[in-house]
Amino acid sequence: MMRPFHLAFPVTDLKLTKSFYVNILKCEVGRSSDAWIDFNMFGHQVVAHLVDENDHPASNSVDGDEVPASHFGVVLTMSQWKELKNHLLEQKIQFIIEPKIRFKGEAGEQATMFFKDPSGNALEFKAFNDDNQIFAK
């Protein structure tokens, strides 16, 4: 069994962050303080830390899209990915990269989508029809 990962990231507004991660991404809240919030994101611990400002780095070209160099997310099952995609569309989330299939017909073919949280952190959620393709060359 794979162990959960831990990721901490900066946010500029804890109230908006909590609303987004709970209501949009359906994360559960763990411990919190006036400076941070733990979230359960698909079984992984992600922690939003309050900062004064958030500087977002550049992007890189990947399969024709400008992908934020700094981003995080979860590799979902294809059914979870489709369910999340439909939920995000219903919530009228503005995508950085619309839901699509990347590397079509190539090694590593995947469903992917990118969007930002209220503090401008880029998130990517992806899925593979065959999990053996996750690290394919």
PLM segments and residue spans:
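N-terminal beta-strand motif that seeds the catalytic metal site of vicinal oxygen chelate
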Residues: 1-15, 72, 127-137
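Vicinal oxygen chelate
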Residues: 4-11, 40, 60-137
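Short N-terminal helix-initiation segments at or just after the protein's N-terminus
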Residues: 7-22, 56-65, 92, 121-122
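Core segments of cupin and vicinal oxygen chelate
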Residues: 10-53
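Non-catalytic surface loops within mature trypsin-like serine protease
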Residues: 13, 43, 52, 76-78, ...
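Short secondary-structure boundary/capping segments
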Residues: 29, 37-38, 61-64, 104-105
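A short local loop/turn or secondary-structure capping micro-motif enriched for an aromatic residue
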Residues: 47-48, 54-58, 131-134
